[in-house]
C-alpha cells in the first residue's frame, strides 16, 4: 500500500507540475488530488522539491 500511495503522489505531482507549473502547485494540492492528508505526503517525500527531484531522476534514467 505504501508503494501505491507513493506512486500516486508521484503521478499526481507530475501531472499537476506539467499542467500548472512547479511554483503554482502546493503539497496540499497534491495531497488533495491524491485523496490523502497533507501530512501523509511526508511519509513518502521530505518536501515538494524531493518530489520534483524524484520525477527528474526518473526521467534521467528513462532517457539514458
Where are the predicted features?
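Conserved hydrophobic/aromatic packing and binding residues within compact polymer-binding modules
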Residues: 9, 30, 41
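Short helix/strand-capping hinge loops at secondary-structure junctions
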Residues: 16-25, 29, 45
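The short coil/loop that forms the "turn" connecting the two helices of the helix-turn-helix
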Residues: 4-5, 36
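Short hydrophobic/aromatic patch on the recognition helix
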Residues: 35-45
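Alpha-helical structural segments
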Residues: 8-15, 19, 33, 50-64
